[in-house]
Regions:
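Short amphipathic alpha-helical coupling elements at transmembrane boundaries
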Residues: 49-52, 66, 70, 90, ...
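Generic alpha-helical transmembrane segments of integral inner-membrane proteins
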Residues: 9, 13-26, 104, 108-116, ...
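Hydrophobic alpha-helical transmembrane segments of membrane transport/permease proteins
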Residues: 16-65, 156, 160-173
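Membrane-water interface at transmembrane helix exits
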Residues: 23, 27, 31, 35, ...
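Alpha-helical transmembrane segments of integral membrane proteins
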Residues: 2-3, 96-129, 145, 168-271
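An internal, D/E-rich "acidic patch" concept
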Residues: 56-115
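Membrane-water interface segments at the C-terminal ends of transmembrane alpha-helices
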Residues: 23-30, 67-69, 135-165, 182-184
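Residue-level signal for discrete positions within transmembrane alpha-helices
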Residues: 12, 95, 99, 135-142
Length: 271
């Protein structure tokens, strides 16, 4: 188990290194004006001096090595346009907590709803709980996320009596974005847990338990459910990361001052 986890962590670190390095290289293809907030008012001498001070005139391999050296020491550089000369680490420290907090709430909600839903679907295979659950999953997966995000916002704001400007101090403002973020994972957990429970229910140890006279509820909860959860657990960390990363549109939709809005703003302003 430890060897497997170490291999997964190693692959994740390598993937992260490759992606970040590629993005770093692609950003170096950005036009020169993207590095300066007042580019139109600057002379050529000032532009070259600014590029030199930022180390952008050095060879690309030198820039990559310097970037990773600074990043490993917690220095991600400074913002050139969003907040001139402000530490990127400081900016992220202000924006990241609310995105992580919202991601945690969405993950907990998806587990609380998705796991029991999948368990009931697997326990009552081909019966009405399974059919209703399957219909809900198909609906969630078939409809584009942006569509039900907008419907949740349209009707939810009226039902809860909240405005469009996010207020972190009022719990009502957390309900709609958290529900929106959790829908995809609810369908994911329910679908896969249902599948794993159906697979487990056909194994020999289940037949043996039935032959011994163990009740179906005990078999489902104490044996099938426990074993079906084992392969599902490995997806929880990646699902959480996907939830946080996928919050970009939702944060923009609800004007949440988190990583999503920050990313959109910085991309639009070429920072």
């Amino acid at each position: 188990m430890l060897k497997y986890l170490a291999k997964r962590v190693g692959r994740s670190i390598l993937t992260l290194f490759i992606i970040v390095t590629l993005v770093f290289c692609l950003l170096r293809l950005m036009p020169v004006e993207g590095y300066f907030a007042n580019y139109e008012k600057m002379t050529e001498v000032q532009i070259q001096a600014g590029l030199q001070s930022m180390g952008l005139l050095d060879p690309l391999p030198v820039q990559i090595v310097r970037f990773w050296k600074d990043a490993l020491h917690g220095d991600l550089g400074v913002s050139h346009i969003y907040k001139v000369n402000a530490s990127v680490t400081g900016i992220l420290a202000k924006k990241l907590p609310i995105s992580v907090q919202m991601g945690v709430y969405a993950m907990l909600l998806s587990l609380v709803i998705g796991i029991p839903m999948g368990m009931f679907m697997g326990r009552f295979k081909s019966r009405w709980p399974d059919k209703i659950g399957t219909a809900i999953i198909v609906l969630i997966q078939a409809v584009p996320s942006a569509v039900y995000y907008l419907y949740i916002q349209m009707y939810g704001t009226t039902a809860l009596g909240v405005g469009l400007l996010f207020d972190a101090s009022n719990w009502k403002y957390w309900v709609l974005p958290v529900c929106s973020m959790s829908l995809g994972n609810i369908a994911f957990y329910a679908m896969w847990l249902r599948r794993y429970m159906v697979d487990e229910s056909n194994k020999d140890y289940v037949r043996l338990a039935r032959a011994k006279g163990v009740s179906e509820n005990n078999i489902a909860l104490r044996h099938i459910f426990r074993n079906a959860m084992v392969p599902l657990v490995q997806y929880i960390p990646s699902a959480f990361l996907n939830t946080v990363v996928g919050s970009i549109y939702i944060e923009s939709l609800y004007s949440i001052p988190g990583m999503g809005g920050l990313l959109v703003t910085c991309v639009q302003r070429h920072d």
